[in-house]
């Protein structure tokens, strides 16, 4: 099979993890008889430095022409003083909107080998942590109207709106139900329906969808309670579906209970098969150039790309199993190092995963 992949190398330490990920993809292509073509696309700080824009149209066009997009991470201290529209993160928002990616799927799973690294009590971890947060990605408060104005008394007031239309809720809700149907058949819709009209509309739409999925156990939970339950009893969750801002916050919380943010991939999908795949961690500017950043989340993101966009389940399994065997051997990067294990740098971890793939 032949596929075209747009590669956003990213900022700070990001190119280091992307380099190792492409090595893994090349090994998969060699082993399974595929051909992957890579096209570099600039976004974030790199694009700001080159073009004065976090995502110029010609760079977005490269992503739209590809079968899928692999991203490292963008941003860093160098660009923090820029106005909002010129910041690296704005490029990511525009990329998601331009590609029509409305569903972010982020797994929260503890690898058994890394269970001691979880900040949760061992008895909670022992119950199992394996759920997915399906987050609506291009609606809500991040894409609503934003304004700051001056009141009559001279003080400033800022207003951000959280708009959602029924079709936006229905399409993400359907992905939530379909995802649950393929897993343990439990879906929890997280909202703030006791306060927000948008949340009440979410519930109304989800109730209509529920009738189409009688095999899925459906429940609802307020976002504040969900934030507590994720650390108190994470084993109760299978799939969580929620709006943009709630999902942003909850998925970051969920990432921390797994023991290492450097192990968590993510996918962003729309109506077709083309998606955006990226690790959930940032660009780690403090360790850039030191060859110590953990490439595993980016490599696992590539595995998600093979599975969800290219239909290459066996190839994705091969990568994930290779990572598991590396962990079985006690090989770690600095972020998830524990007593009795061997600490590897970024390139060495890439080498170890490649060796397990061979």
Task: Give the positions of each predicted feature.
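Glycine-rich phosphate/diphosphate-binding loop of Rossmann-like nucleotide-binding domains
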Residues: 6-23, 27-29, 153-224, 236
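Buried hydrophobic positions in well-ordered alpha/beta secondary-structure cores of metabolic enzymes
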Residues: 11-14, 67, 134, 176, ...
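Generic secondary-structure signature for well-ordered alpha-helical cores
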Residues: 26, 30-34, 65-68, 97-104, ...
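Glycine-rich phosphate/nucleotide-binding loop
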Residues: 45-48, 231-331
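N-terminal glycine-rich phosphate/adenylate-binding segment common to multiple enzyme folds
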Residues: 49-159, 245
